[in-house]
Structure formats: structure tokens, C-alpha cells
């Protein structure tokens, strides 16, 4: 749709490069984001800001017309970056809302409901795509565009409970921070240094990075490879649902 003037290889290549670039920027900025919010106690504010930017960018894709692949990639890349950056702060909230002995339970419940909610919306959107002729859509592309709008609205609705109920802890500043960005870099350096001195933590983080990078690669490129193999859209959707 957006890349109608591109070959399938070009479309896949540009999309993967966009994902790689946004993830690389996250890799560079993530430690600073974490340290910065630790210093000034602004996890909630920045999380909501990042998530709102992502919501807007995903919603804008609904209005992006055919052939506008550059605009689509830009909005997608921005949404991907700020979504992932927001997850850093979202994960930090866990240690603020419960005790250490309940971390695993609360985290597990959160992931379960997250997969259920995401899977439910994906199922609804898949039905819209497969049966667009029976609905109010003029073509299947219109159903896909509408799916981006539903994701944006869905995302916004489930942001509200956290935005309304959660409050950041007040950070007591013992001295005025002349340059909070410099302080965040210092804190990041201190954290990296402490990790490098602890072999077990270092190996765990390295293993997790390689594992999760593989998972994200499969998630982001599975549909592309399936399309290159000329698999039917219905078969791809069923495979993703399973």
C-alpha cells in the first residue's frame, strides 16, 4: 500500500533498516533515560510523554495515503523508538508498586493481561481484514489502515489507569543539580562500571540482550519473510494468532 512503487525486497529492506535505526538510537539513549528519571523522579511524566508520542504516530498512519512510504517509515520509526523507550520506564514502575517478594507474580500477571489484550485486538483487526467485504470497508487496505487507528485508541485507553492512579515518588535533592544531563551520564557510567565488575550480572545481561534481540528480530521480520515466500495473508494471520 504505502510502498506500492517499491519492490518487495525494497519494502522489506527499508522497513528493517528503520527498525534497526530506531533500536540503535534506543541502545544509545536508554541508559541515560533511566539515569535521568532516577535523578529527577520523572518516570511517570516522561513515560506518558513517550507513550503519547507513540500513540499519535501510530494514529497518523491511518491518514497516510498510498505511496507515501517515506512518511510511513518516519512515523513508524518514531513510534517504535518511543514505545521501546517508554517500556524502560514502565518496567521501572514495577519496583515502585509492590514488594520484592511479589515482583514475579505482578510481572507475570501484567505480561499475561498484556498478551491477552494485544491478542484480542489483533484478532478483531484480523477479522476486519479477512472479512472487509462484509463490513463497511471499500477494500482490504482500508481495513488495515483502520487497524492502526484502533491500536492508537486502544493504547490510549489502557494508558489512562496508570496515568490517573500512579504517582512518582518525590526525589529529595540534597544539593542543586547544576546540569542534570551531566549527572545522568555520570550515573550511567557508574552503573556500567559496577556491572562490568560483577561477572554474573554482566553474563546475564549479555545473554538476555542476545535472546531478546533474536525474539524482536523474529517478531519484526516474520511477516516480511512470509510475504517474500508468497504465503497467503490468511495463513500468515492464523500463524501469528497461534
Where is each model-derived feature located?
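Juxtamembrane intracellular "pre-TM" segments in multi-pass secondary transporters
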Residues: 167-206, 228
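Hydrophobic core of transmembrane alpha-helices in multi-pass small-molecule transporters
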Residues: 57-60, 67-86, 210
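Glycine-rich segments within core transmembrane alpha-helices of 12-TM secondary carriers
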Residues: 26, 104-130
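Pair of pore-lining "gating" transmembrane helices in MFS-fold secondary transporters
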Residues: 1-4, 77, 193-218
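Short amphipathic helix-loop junctions that connect adjacent transmembrane helices
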Residues: 1-12, 220-238
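C-terminal ends and interior cores of transmembrane alpha-helices
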Residues: 27, 48-69
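C-terminal membrane-cytosol helix-exit motif in multi-pass small-molecule transporters
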Residues: 121-134, 152-172
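Central cavity-lining transmembrane alpha-helices of secondary-active solute carriers
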Residues: 12-35, 122, 242
